[in-house]
């Protein structure tokens, strides 16, 4: 069964809807009171971005959803911080999916959690181990767990209707998670990610290498899970019930968090080298992470180390990507870890600098071990990565096997939105760092917006695309992000079950390669990727902006074992 039969555009079938969950009309939290008879609350607006004429009182074409509408938050356990769970080969971990109580920016809310934690447990396992994860679903929504980036056996990939049936409330499913590659991975649902992931269902999986010198020396390691959430003075804004809202740009939050904290802080010593494992779990936001005056070098990304370490000023990390960076804090004082972007105001036709603090590091004047501090100066060459890539180099310069183009079509959007979008000439900005049109974005749902991946050779779109490969195939794919669609937007492209190299962007060759499972494609750009088809099964390719996924931007391909 191909994915199109499960992820039906608009309807999204039972496992991908919230229709079985009590609607807002059945009850409200005190902190989730409505301001409209429909149950919706007005999306927070920037005072510099006026509402379009004719949109007053307009609400999305779907019903609002909030979790646990008949539940008293006081009866739920308060979410706990993530805990490290070291596992050996063939160890078993039980995970429950349940409602939890969270307080964010002063608002008490019902959210979801894995084992009552927010983020979920940090699972640690050695490379080449297999760990058993037994999942019990204790929420009303069906769910699954997708082991993002892991080249896992297909039947455990967590895609409803393709690799398994969704885990309904009260039911369980057992995953066998084999981890062939060292690095930082993460796990999350593949049922209405726009809701479940945003409500807290995510966690990291750290796969350790047997090589003690796999990464360079560091005084310590920190895991940073980057996220945002959309809130007003009542708490979290409702999600779409029948299908997602925010289908044009994805749901940007206005409150940013590190490891679920809005005021994250940490301490460091002068000269201390801290290894940061960064994961972006936001629905739509791409972060540009800076570390103030500290010195940063990039070490690894999704599925491997880079060919060589490199000093950088910032890290652009799209939804679902991971990066490993080493940072040395040279001077005492406070260092702000920030999201530093060039935001856009479409109404005024202006770009402006915006800096949002994610965490504050207080560096004292006690010196860290100087040997590790000096070792940071060395930019290491990862010869093992270069040797791993070497057999693929003969394929770099050849013509692409497949070409895709991204676009969008709309039907039934409010005429004021259509007129405004068609008259705006600024939408070719390479990256949408912020929600520059919150009202229009909120009103657009997956009922009216279809995001498209189109096979340029056949004209097939999304679920119509039907690619077949053999294990061992090396496939070059060229992806174009057209700048002249109704609303061009950057897309983090995720390929399940395999690994790939980003060979070039806009014809400029990548001089420092790393194995990836997700890569950002800016507006107007063309990206060449080389995919190693090593893992048999039926696998997804999709945009990892959650709302774009559920607005159709996905298809599946099949990898089969060659006959003996």
Regions found by a protein language model. Give the residues of each.
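Hydrophobic or amphipathic alpha-helical targeting/insertion segments
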Residues: 171-214
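Bacterial N-terminal signal peptides
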Residues: 10-20
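Histidine- and aromatic-rich segments of cupredoxin/plastocyanin-like copper-binding domains
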Residues: 155-168, 238-400, 506-510, 514-516
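Extended terminal and domain-junction accessory segments
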Residues: 28-94, 98, 197-231, 307-474, ...
């Amino acid at each position: 069964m191909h994915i199109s039969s499960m992820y039906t555009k608009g309807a999204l079938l039972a496992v991908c809807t919230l229709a079985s969950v009590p609607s807002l009309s059945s009850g409200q939290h005190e902190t989730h009171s409505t301001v409209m008879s429909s149950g919706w609350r007005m999306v927070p607006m920037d005072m510099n971005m006026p509402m379009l004429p004719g949109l007053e009182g307009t609400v999305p074409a779907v019903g609002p959803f909030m979790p646990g509408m008949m539940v008293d938050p006081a009866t739920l356990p308060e979410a706990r911080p993530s805990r490290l769970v070291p596992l050996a080969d063939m160890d078993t971990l039980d995970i429950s999916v349940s409602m939890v109580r969270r307080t964010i920016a002063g608002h008490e809310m019902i959210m979801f959690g894995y084992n009552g934690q927010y983020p979920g447990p940090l699972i640690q396992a050695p490379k080449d181990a297999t760990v058993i994860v037994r999942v019990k679903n204790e929420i009303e929504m069906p769910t699954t767990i997708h082991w993002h980036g892991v080249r896992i056996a297909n039947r455990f990939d967590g895609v409803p209707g393709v690799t398994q049936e969704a885990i309904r409330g009260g039911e369980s499913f057992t995953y066998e998670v084999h981890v062939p590659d060292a690095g930082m991975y993460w796990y999350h649902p593949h049922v209405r990610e726009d809701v479940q992931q945003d409500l807290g269902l995510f966690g990291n999986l750290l796969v350790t290498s047997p090589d003690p010198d796999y990464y360079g020396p560091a005084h310590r390691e920190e895991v940073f899970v980057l996220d945002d959430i959309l809130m007003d003075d009542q708490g979290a804004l409702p999600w779409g019930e029948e299908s997602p809202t925010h289908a044009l740009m994805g749901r940007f939050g206005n409150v940013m968090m590190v490891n679920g904290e809005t005021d994250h802080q940490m301490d460091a010593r002068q000269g201390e080298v801290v290894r940061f494992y960064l994961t972006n779990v936001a629905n739509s936001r791409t972060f540009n992470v800076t570390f103030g005056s500290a010195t940063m070098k990039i070490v690894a990304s999704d599925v491997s180390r880079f060919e060589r370490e490199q000093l950088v000023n910032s890290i652009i990390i799209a939804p679902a990507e991971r990066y490993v960076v080493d940072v040395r804090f040279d001077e005492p004082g406070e260092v702000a870890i920030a999201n530093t972007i060039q935001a856009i105001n479409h109404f005024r036709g202006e770009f402006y600098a915006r800096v949002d603090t994610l965490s504050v590091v207080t560096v004292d004047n006690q010196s860290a071990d100087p040997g590790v501090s000096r070792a940071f100066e060395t930019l290491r060459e990862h010869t093992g990565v270069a040797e791993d890539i070497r057999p693929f180099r003969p394929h770099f310069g050849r013509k692409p096997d497949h070409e895709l183009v991204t676009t969008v079509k709309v039907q039934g959007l409010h005429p004021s939105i259509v007129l405004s979008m068609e008259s705006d000439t600024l939408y070719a900005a390479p990256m949408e760092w912020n929600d520059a049109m919150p009202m229009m974005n909120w009103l657009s749902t997956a009922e009216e917006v279809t995001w498209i991946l189109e096979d340029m050779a056949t004209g097939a779109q999304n679920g119509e695309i039907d690619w077949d490969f053999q294990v061992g195939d090396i496939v070059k794919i060229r992806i174009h992000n057209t700048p002249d669609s109704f609303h061009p937007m950057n897309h983090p492209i995720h390929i399940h079950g395999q690994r790939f190299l980003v060979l070039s962007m806009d014809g400029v060759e990548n001089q420092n390669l790393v194995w990836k499972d997700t890569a950002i494609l800016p507006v107007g750009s063309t990206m060449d990727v080389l995919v190693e088809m090593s893992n048999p099964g039926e696998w997804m390719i999709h945009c990892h902006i959650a709302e774009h996924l559920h607005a159709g931007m996905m298809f599946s391909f099949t990898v089969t074992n060659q006959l003996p």
